[in-house]
Regions:
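Nucleotide-sugar-dependent glycosyltransferase catalytic core
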Residues: 59, 66, 70-92
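Short, surface-exposed, polar/charged, turn-prone segments marking secondary-structure boundaries
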Residues: 1-2, 55-56, 74-75, 92-95, ...
Length: 142
């Protein structure tokens, strides 16, 4: 996930900036606010629970900021296999859209995720990539 010494695959601002959400691995929140929000959504196991918490905070008038000067290191360098991550991201995104967005937005998210999975299953067959084939075949069933 890291490129070079400190450049993330996803864009990271160079200055303090208001953002939609931050990774749970680097999330700092006051205990009172966390309690007011009733913690993480127990339906979302991993990978989207941080985004969902920040979204609920925003709906209550609280903002999320990214501080690039703060460096945190994840001791174990990961939370599971790539397949585990992909499947839980799919589940989490769909739960987020079902809970917070309109039915049309949920269906659009579902269509986009299924389309991506179908394309990657086909690609996995074409290039004989067992990981793509197995992972995204499972994702199609979500």
């Amino acid at each position: 996930m890291l490129i070079g010494s400190n450049k993330l695959l996803r864009e990271s601002p160079d200055e303090i900036k208001r953002v939609d959400w931050v990774s749970g691995a680097s999330l700092m929140i006051k205990k009172t606010l966390f309690q007011k929000l009733e913690g993480f959504d127990k339906e979302i196991f991993m990978y989207v629970e941080d985004m969902e918490l920040c979204y609920r905070a925003l709906k209550k008038g609280f903002f999320t900021y990214f501080y690039p000067q703060i460096m945190l290191f994840h001791k174990e360098l990961g939370s599971g296999s790539r397949t585990f991550a992909i499947l839980n991201i799919y589940k989490g995104v769909l739960l987020f859209f079902r809970k917070h967005k309109s039915k049309l937005e949920y269906l659009l998210a579902l269509l986009l995720l299924k389309t991506k999975a179908a394309v990657l299953v086909v690609l996995g067959k074409i290039i004989n990539n067992k990981y793509l084939l197995e992972t995204y075949s499972q994702a199609l069933k979500i």
